[in-house]
Amino acid sequence: MQGQESVIRKLEELLGEVSEQEDYQRFIHDIRRVASLQDQYREQTQQLQVDRLGRTADQLTDEEKAQQQRAGERQTELARQLEDVLNRMLLMRERLQEGDPISAGVLSQVIAIAQQQALSGQMRESGRDIERNRLGHALRVQLEVHEDLVSMLSILSNRHEYRLD
């Protein structure tokens, strides 16, 4: 009986490690997707800026205004998606705090970047700027956000460097 319990505990431990690895891979996938979309949205904003050069919001056609409204909404939705990923990271960090402090520390670094730079807030601000035809400012913010997302991705992708085993 004791041997079976030992095997069961070991299997549960291994299953937990596999689950943790899957969670990390999911975080990498999700942050990579958000970063890729952020870069696409930045390119779209840049094209909007070129197309509307020298015109105020009042001088835009209804279709152009609607196009900017949709672009701003997409940016805001992407901010919400990032918040969802960060919330999942927070939960995982709490679970790992005691049993795997190194992995919890890696997640803390990633979360800290997002919080210190107020990434989701900046993304929402960029969305509002797009809707208000403040495309130059929106572009700068989008570029900064993308750079921070790439930093987060780098930390997550290289987490094995932080491990001692």
What are these regions (language model features)?
Residues M1-D165:
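Extended alpha-helical rod segments
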